[in-house]
Amino acid sequence: GKPICGETCFKGKCYTPGCTCSYPICKKN
Protein backbone atom coordinates (compact mmCIF):
# COMPACT_ATOMS: atom_id res chain seq x y z
CA GLY A 1 0.00 0.00 0.00
CA LYS A 2 0.92 3.62 -0.16
CA PRO A 3 2.57 5.35 2.77
CA ILE A 4 0.23 7.23 5.06
CA CYS A 5 1.42 10.55 6.39
CA GLY A 6 0.03 11.28 9.79
CA GLU A 7 2.72 10.64 12.32
CA THR A 8 3.87 13.36 14.66
CA CYS A 9 7.03 15.01 13.42
CA PHE A 10 9.86 16.03 15.68
CA LYS A 11 12.57 18.51 14.67
CA GLY A 12 10.97 18.82 11.24
CA LYS A 13 11.58 15.22 10.24
CA CYS A 14 9.16 12.66 8.88
CA TYR A 15 10.13 9.03 8.65
CA THR A 16 7.43 8.14 6.12
CA PRO A 17 8.70 8.50 2.53
CA GLY A 18 7.04 11.27 0.53
CA CYS A 19 5.95 13.21 3.59
CA THR A 20 6.96 16.58 4.93
CA CYS A 21 6.60 18.07 8.38
CA SER A 22 3.67 20.42 8.80
CA TYR A 23 4.11 20.72 12.55
CA PRO A 24 2.95 18.84 14.45
CA ILE A 25 1.82 16.32 11.83
CA CYS A 26 3.41 14.91 8.68
CA LYS A 27 1.54 15.70 5.47
CA LYS A 28 1.96 14.46 1.91
CA ASN A 29 4.22 16.70 -0.11
Curated annotation (Swiss-Prot):
Q: Which domain of life is it from?
A: Eukaryota
Query: Cross-link named Cyclopeptide (Gly-Asn), where?
Result: G1-N29
Q: Which Pfam families match?
A: Cyclotide (PF03784)
What InterPro entries has UniProt attached to this entry?
Cyclotide (IPR005535), Cyclotide_sf (IPR036146)
SUPFAM superfamilies assigned to the protein according to its UniProt record, in alphabetical order: Cyclotides
Question: Which range is the signal sequence, renumbered to this chain?
Answer: none
Give disulfide pairs as residue numbers: C5-C19, C9-C21, C14-C26
Q: Does the keyword Disulfide bond apply?
A: yes
One GO biological process term: killing of cells of another organism
UniProt keyword list: Cytolysis, Disulfide bond, Knottin, Plant defense
Q: How is it modified after translation?
A: This is a cyclic peptide.
**Function noted in UniProt:** Probably participates in a plant defense mechanism (Potential). Binds to and induces leakage in phospholipd membranes, particularly ones containing 1-palmitoyl-2-oleophosphatidylethanolamine (POPE). In vitro, displays cytotoxicity against cultured cells. Not active against Gram-negative bacterium E.coli ATCC 25922 or Gram-positive bacterium S.aureus ATCC 25923 up to a concentration of 64 uM.
Q: What is known of its domains?
A: The presence of a 'disulfide through disulfide knot' structurally defines this protein as a knottin.
Q: Which family does it belong to?
A: Belongs to the cyclotide family. Moebuis subfamily.
What is the name listed in the Swiss-Prot or TrEMBL entry for this protein?
Cyclotide mela-4
